[in-house]
Amino acid sequence: MILKNVKLKSGEITVPGDKSLSHRSVLFAALCKGKSKVTGFLEAEDPLNTMSAFTKLGLKVRKVKPGEYEFESPGKRGFISPNVDLDFGNAGTGIRLSAGLLCGLPGVNAVLTGDGSLKKRPMGRIIKPLTAMGASILGLGEKETAPLKVEGKKLKSFRYESPIASAQIKSCLMLAAIASETDLEYSENILSRDHTENMFRFLGNKIEQISPFHFKIEPPYVLNGGEFKVPGDISSAAFFLVLGVLAKEGNLLVRNIGLNPARIGILKALELMGAKIEIRNQRMECGEPVGDLKTYPSILNKTNIPKSLIPSIIDEIPILSVAGLFAKGGFEIRHAEELRAKESDRIHTMVSNFRALGIEVEEYPDGYAFDGTSPQSLEIWKFLASGKKISILSHMDHRITMSFLIFKTLSGFNLHIDETSWIETSFPGFEKLLESCLDE
């Protein structure tokens, strides 16, 4: 266990808009013929790349002010084949969901690509079910990776049992069915994020819920323009929740955060560890639950993270693991093999960086465990506390970078993180906001 070493200014903060909802607001605005509006849009590289891709297909975009955009779409029958590749940068959500949508647009042909990191991420998980729907989609990279070549066509009715709980697979197939005006019946073994379903309902559509993890949609679909309000991203708030509960003094009130039941696993996991976090001012906006979160300095302990929580905390596991460094008894995460398919292999990345800190970590195919109190780690921590520098490798991963910036702040250790520019993919202004929270 590492000692806490930071005091906070008690006050209110806001974090950027939800990344998942920002991507989806562009996709539904594109599907809806006519005008739509979004407020609270995350102006970070990933969703902006999705927006840029659809402008090349015929979507008109006007920025009203920071975070607020107006869209005018020709509708799904009015899109054109772009004369350039659609570059999604590092946006795995953007490329997978857009691939599904474009597969269902007859006559629209496109190549979807991204940066070096994105080209390593698995695409077979969407290619296989889309192909079974009748789609024409090829992974041009090794092992069915991006670039993706799509030739839009009319798709057939489809029933799919997903082998993994994945909101990206589910949303990809939903958007393919919606674009192609066809039926989809979908089931999964654990409930994944349901932002796409909520936005779909918000537009006036019905979903037949066969069981908690099994649903069906069928045309005709209602695709009229609307106003989408994007709340703050709980995955971004998670960094400041951990900062708040591990501070020696001070409270943070993080305002206007999306509290979708499939996303609040981070709150449940932190509470299982002993964190005190209060939910205030709960309300509904555009089909999504929203509220404010207040943190209190807490004493954390090792706990068992239930398998059922893993899909809802998959993006927050790096920062949750950092919290584990300050917990009595250490930390263990299992059933999280999906971490290996993120922006980096997050299991290996976290393990290697923890080992650089001198922590004895047991790596598993689906996670890792550490107690944090070995003689070797205690010697290294004394070494770090004396001001000696140690290097942390980000592996081009924004969440790894931000997690270790929080660790550096809490511990006071002189860490050097090789590159912090990756933060721009999801949280512009992160370091400035972090600095503003500290009571010097």
Swiss-Prot record:
The keyword Hydrolase belongs to this UniProt entry's keyword annotation: no
PROSITE patterns for the chain: EPSP_SYNTHASE_2
GO biological process: amino acid biosynthetic process; aromatic amino acid family biosynthetic process; chorismate biosynthetic process
PANTHER family: AROM/DEHYDROQUINATE SYNTHASE, PENTAFUNCTIONAL AROM POLYPEPTIDE
A Pfam family hit: EPSP_synthase
Main location: cytoplasm
CC annotations in GO: cytoplasm
InterPro entries: Enolpyruvate_Tfrase_dom, Enolpyruvate_Tfrase_sf, EPSP_synthase, EPSP_synthase_CS, RNA3'P_cycl/enolpyr_Trfase_a/b
Keyword field: Amino-acid biosynthesis, Aromatic amino acid biosynthesis, Cytoplasm, Transferase
Binding site for 3-phosphoshikimate: K19, S20, R24, S166, Q168, D315, K342
Name by which UniProt lists this protein: 3-phosphoshikimate 1-carboxyvinyltransferase
EC number, UniProt record: 2.5.1.19
